[in-house]
Amino acid sequence: MGKEKSHINVVVIGHVDSGKSTTTGHLIYKCGGIDKRTIEKFEKEAAELGKGSFKYAWVLDKLKSERERGITIDIALWKFETPKYMVTVIDAPGHRDFIKNMITGTSQADCAILIIAAGTGEFEAGISKDGQTREHALLAYTLGVKQLIVAINKMDTTKWSEARYQEIIKETSGFIKKVGYNPKHVPFVPISGFNGDNMIEVSSNCPWYKGWEKETKAKATGKTLLEAIDAIDPPSRPTDKPLRLPLQDVYKIGGIGTVPVGRVETGTIKGGMVVTFAPAGVTTEVKSVEMHHEQLSEGLPGDNVGFNVKNVSVKEIRRGNVAGDSKNDPPKGCDSFNAQVIVLNHPGQVGAGYAPVLDCHTAHIACKFSELVEKIDRRTGKSVEAAPKFIKSGDAAIVKMVPSKPMCVEAFTDYPPLGRFAVRDMRQTVAVGVIKSVAKSDKQGAGKVTKAAVKAGKK
């Protein structure tokens, strides 16, 4: 078997019709975790429905509809392998809560794959001022996804025109540069997700294409999308920090009890550890930790784990709570926090008293802009105006925020995934923010400490 491959997470972004599902479906189908039985079942259904040509998007549609009906699909289905990595697709967009998932989920992405449609008019629509592509790319960058791959899709619809490809690359380079990415660090790959050109094998349709190159830690070159994914710089995982694990769900499982589920962001979690949930203020012992239905000796950053806890009911902890080690900088709720907020698209002006919903890690809570401390220059971070009355689209400011109910957040410099958020209002992301400092509440004293925690503490 050899050593297990390292795991990386990618998020696929781009305009609604760019072919994200087809491209992602293709990778999962060809290199992936979908077992032959499932594929045969899907193919049979596709044939019965007259979708006999069986396109990859169908795989994804099946997975997606099952996910939206609340059937949890084995997450292994969203995986595929490259020579070096086991890749998990964090979200296949088109999923209803994509932007929200970007915020709660991009913190998990090591790389974003931007799919751009090459068709006449399609490309232009995708990166126009109000195109989703711009918003997705900006979000990915602001939320710390520092690596990017650009796939120029649907090249077959342009008859594999080199001129069109060059035009798109030029535009896209300018576009991603404005967002913050350095085009020299980004591989550009012309593909057809539908026909499979340059996805896994080199296409014979574009003899003019000499391959992609990028210069990050080392120079890398290649031809296909799969090779570009394989050339992602290995992410550093913050194992040495104290544990922070935002809960995605809490299940009650017969015969086992209460099982919180979430992704380890920093630190490690193992059986026997005494954890504190904030802002709930509940402290208890972790009995065991598992991932993909297998018991783990410890959960590491990047792992999506379930762990069972003693003497805690499902009512006491919920999505948005954060678990941490009770003996090593345990998480706490906060009274307020200061953040650098960038207003992306708000139709009016934002002043003190504005109270939109914040999505920070898995928490979804209304927070009041209680004070606009100063307006700053987005590029330099220098103050340009103290205590502004209002801020509007395009502005950046330091804002004091007060959550409407207890929430657990951290400074971005201490725990990045818990220190960035999106501001949602009017069904769109109106702003994104990075937390500078947190006023933690010390109401923990009155919290609940279970018998199991006390017992474990004596060991």
UniProtKB/Swiss-Prot annotation:
Record-listed N6-methyllysine modification sites: K3, K30, K315, K389
Region (G3): 91-94
Annotated region described as G2, given as residue ranges: 70-74
Protein localization: Cytoplasm
Free-text function comment from the UniProt entry: This protein promotes the GTP-dependent binding of aminoacyl-tRNA to the A-site of ribosomes during protein biosynthesis.
Domain tr-type G intervals: 5-239
Binding-site list for GTP: 14-21, 91-95, 153-156
Modified residue annotations for N,N,N-trimethylglycine: G2
Name the record gives this protein: Elongation factor 1-alpha
